[in-house]
């Protein structure tokens, strides 16, 4: 397994093995290879959580930039990841589905991000749905773990609670719902179906190509933990 030197999963807890839940190149924005907890908190079972943003063939997250990029919000559908298919990272059973949260305008400007941060407390008080947005929780078949995939597009979830899914089966599409400043996928593994009561579990991804954010030839990774800003692409199983 390849991981950054400061990644310290519990040695008594074997990592949850997953495949990347998307196709094409995505940049790793937050990762436990950089720090644990990766999002600055152990709350909601996200100690070992990942955030990924989709890229185009020029490694851009959005198709354009203009005056709105500098001073205000932007349409979510301007971003490459918006409405990209999100796939099951392993075989399992859908134990929870939440849909109905709107997709927000996206934010890249410092001013719009500051305004958003000032409303963070309000979202937390509104409950889990306001944080995760539209999401799917899977109970994995091959190990005692649950995986949450969050910030999906409003109305995009294609699987009902109770459904059994295979690895690679579409669950929904990437959106900008919940606590999200631009379309991205949040994923983490946990030891309970409800993130409120769960503890986070470490993850390794199997079968992908990785390359530095600044460019360079991709290299194959059999089992690994993507580094921060690393660009990853799933390889066929």
PLM ranges: what are they?
Residues 1-37, 43-45, 231-237:
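Terminal presequence/propeptide segments associated with secretion/organelle targeting
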Residues 86-96, 159-173:
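Short, well-structured beta-strand-loop connectors
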Residues 47-49, 83, 132-136:
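Short glycine-rich loop/turn motifs
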Residues 58, 100-102, 171-181:
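Short, charged beta-turn/beta-strand-edge "cap" motif at the junction between a beta-strand
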Residues 30, 54, 96, 151-154, ...:
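A residue-level detector for short acidic-glycine micro-motifs
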Residues 37-39, 128, 163-166, 188-237:
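Acidic, glycine-rich catalytic/binding loops that coordinate metals and/or anionic ligands
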Residues 93-153:
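Zn2+-dependent peptidoglycan hydrolase active-site motif and core
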Residues 80-82, 131-132, 157-158:
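Short, small/polar residue-rich loop motifs at catalytic or cofactor-binding pockets
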């Amino acid at each position: 397994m390849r991981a950054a030197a400061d990644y310290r999963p519990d040695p008594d807890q074997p990592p949850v093995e997953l495949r990347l839940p998307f196709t094409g190149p995505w940049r790793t924005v937050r990762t436990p290879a950089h720090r644990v907890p990766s999002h600055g908190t152990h709350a909601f079972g996200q100690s070992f959580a990942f955030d990924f943003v989709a890229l185009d063939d020029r490694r851009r997250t959005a198709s354009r930039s203009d005056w709105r990029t500098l001073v205000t919000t932007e349409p979510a559908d301007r971003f490459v990841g918006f409405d990209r298919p999100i796939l099951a990272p392993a075989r399992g059973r859908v134990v929870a589905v939440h849909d109905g949260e709107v997709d927000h305008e996206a934010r890249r400007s410092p001013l719009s991000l500051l305004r958003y941060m000032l409303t963070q407390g309000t979202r937390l008080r509104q409950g889990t749905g306001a944080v995760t947005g539209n999401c799917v929780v899977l109970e994995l078949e091959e190990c005692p773990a649950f995986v949450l995939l969050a910030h999906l597009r409003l109305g995009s979830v294609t699987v009902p609670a109770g459904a059994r899914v295979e690895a690679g089966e579409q669950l929904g599409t990437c959106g900008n719902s919940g606590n999200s400043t631009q379309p991205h996928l949040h994923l983490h593994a946990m030891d309970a179906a409800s993130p409120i009561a769960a503890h986070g579990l470490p993850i390794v991804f199997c079968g992908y190509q990785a390359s530095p954010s600044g460019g360079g030839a991709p290299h194959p990774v059999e089992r690994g933990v993507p580094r921060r800003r690393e660009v990853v692409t799933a390889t066929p199983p």
